[in-house]
């Protein structure tokens, strides 16, 4: 059973809020949106007080969300964004004007959502309770409404149809890409997964499709658009401007963001688009954290994401010795990821992360050997693994830590968390 919010304690601290969120169940007993709808009712429907763009897809959601918000912000709109997961702190999930909200604002938003959740749970029949992601999403919508944002760019968590974010009357929906992920919940085929994600499409909405979409996903998109009366916009692969974040995939993501911003706002100012492209920051995606050797963190966590990463590496490494630090969760296609990553690396160190679903490093090392790669070195502590990789690469080499967003989070965290990490 989820924890009840503390009573008679006045305003919560950020630590109070984080402890409460982490006490909640990850999944409800009933799969659906009923709890979330009741939360919105208890909070007086904050999600209806701003315009919205809904971002779904297998890869590229967070980057596209940030990029779309950056373009709209530079066109004079007061923007908000909701993202998941976070890297260092829950505050990163809720952004206003391209800045994370303050810890005090996060605490107040969660406190509002917690009291709404208590009302919903008390009125519920049976043991079903509001979940962690539902409270976070409710807190985000509450805070975005309280901050008077004009438009929020909202990243879905899992799928679309029954994702807690799917209570917004979005004007524009974005499908970035579709690959085989979360098949236990979304279905075994690309078409099944696309169908679940595309359930966010609104009647008369505008559906922006990422370039290179799988043909089965494209067919589903056309069918959904026809049924809902939505207009399809196909984003090009080239954004038409220089993009600051590293990676070929980020150029594609910015092209999608540009198409979405135009669908929402109308004709865009090229200079403002170029400024957004140059200035937007994307943590955890080919993020440079050190030089000599060049050290990069990237949260690619499935074969498609690793393929996009591998495509981008040659223009970044320039043939320099590259050492990878890898951790992968146990529900991912580790073999598919490693098979794509190994040819791009000269050496590999396998490690773990705080996420309890991280594969044991010996398992990863064995799998690397089975795939014909060089012997993988095992260093269980992520920070020690990164330092070992930097030594192996030498000052002129490249170090890449990837395979899990949770590995990236561990490496970016400035100090060990006193609370257990969220696995959402």
Predicted regions and their residues:
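N-terminal leader/targeting and accessory segments in enzymes
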Residues: 1-59, 63-78, 87-89, 208-209
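ATP-dependent carboxylate-amine ligase catalytic core
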Residues: 9, 27, 33-48, 74-168, ...
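Short Gly/Thr/Asp-enriched flexible loops that form oxyanion-binding sites at enzyme active sites
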Residues: 68, 161-171, 412-414
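Acidic, Mg2+-coordinating active-site environments of NTP-dependent enzymes
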Residues: 120-124, 135, 147-155, 170-271
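Short, high-confidence coil segments that cap the C-terminus of an alpha-helix
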Residues: 148-150, 319, 394-396
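Nucleotide phosphate-binding/pyrophosphate-handling subdomain across enzymes
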Residues: 151-154, 163-174, 178-179, 192, ...
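C-terminal helical cap/extension that packs against the catalytic core
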Residues: 212-233, 262, 294-295, 338-398
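Active-site-proximal loop/hinge segments that shape catalytic or ion-binding/gating pockets
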Residues: 404
């Amino acid at each position: 059973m989820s924890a009840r919010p503390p009573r008679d304690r006045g305003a919560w601290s950020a630590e109070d809020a984080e402890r409460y969120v982490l006490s909640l169940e990850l999944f409800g007993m009933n799969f659906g949106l009923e709890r979330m709808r009741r939360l919105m009712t208890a909070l007086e429907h904050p999600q209806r007080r701003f315009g919205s763009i809904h971002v779904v897809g297998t890869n590229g959601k967070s980057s596209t969300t940030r990029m779309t918000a950056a373009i709209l912000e530079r066109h004079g709109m007061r923007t908000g964004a909701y993202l998941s997961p976070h890297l260092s702190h829950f505050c990163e999930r809720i952004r206003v004007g391209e800045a994370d909200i303050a810890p005090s604002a996060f605490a107040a938003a969660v406190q509002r959502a917690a009291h709404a959740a208590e009302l919903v749970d008390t009125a519920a029949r049976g043991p079903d309770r509001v979940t962690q992601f539902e409270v976070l999403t409710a807190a985000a919508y509450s805070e975005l409404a309280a901050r008077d944002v004009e438009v929020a760019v909202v990243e879905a968590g899992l799928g679309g149809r029954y994702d807690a974010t799917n209570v917004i009357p979005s004007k524009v929906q974005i499908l970035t890409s579709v690959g085989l992920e979360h098949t236990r919940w979304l279905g075994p085929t690309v078409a099944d997964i696309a169908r679940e994600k595309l359930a966010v499409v609104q009647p008369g909405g505008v559906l922006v499709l990422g370039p290179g979409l799988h043909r089965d996903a494209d067919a589903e998109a056309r069918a959904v658009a026809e049924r809902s009366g939505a207009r399809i916009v196909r984003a090009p692969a080239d954004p038409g401007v220089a993009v600051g974040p590293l990676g070929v995939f980020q150029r594609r993501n910015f092209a999608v963001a540009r198409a979405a911003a135009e669908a929402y706002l109308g004709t865009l100012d090229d200079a403002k688009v170029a400024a957004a492209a140059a200035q937007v920051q994307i943590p955890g995606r080919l993020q440079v954290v050190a030089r000599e050797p060049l050290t990069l963190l990237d949260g690619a966590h499935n074969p498609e994401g690793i393929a996009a990463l591998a495509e981008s590496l040659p223009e970044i490494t320039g043939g320099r010795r590259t050492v990878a630090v890898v951790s992968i969760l146990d529900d991912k296609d580790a073999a598919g990821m490693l098979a794509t990553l190994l040819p791009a690396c000269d050496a590999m160190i396998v490690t773990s992360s705080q996420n309890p679903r991280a594969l044991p490093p010996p398992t990863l090392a064995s799998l690397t050997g089975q795939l014909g790669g060089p012997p993988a070195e095992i260093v269980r502590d992520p920070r020690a693994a990164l330092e070992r990789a930097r030594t192996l690469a030498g000052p002129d080499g490249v170090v890449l830590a990837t395979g899990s967003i949770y590995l990236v989070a561990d490496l970016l965290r400035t100090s060990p968390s006193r609370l257990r990490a969220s696995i959402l």
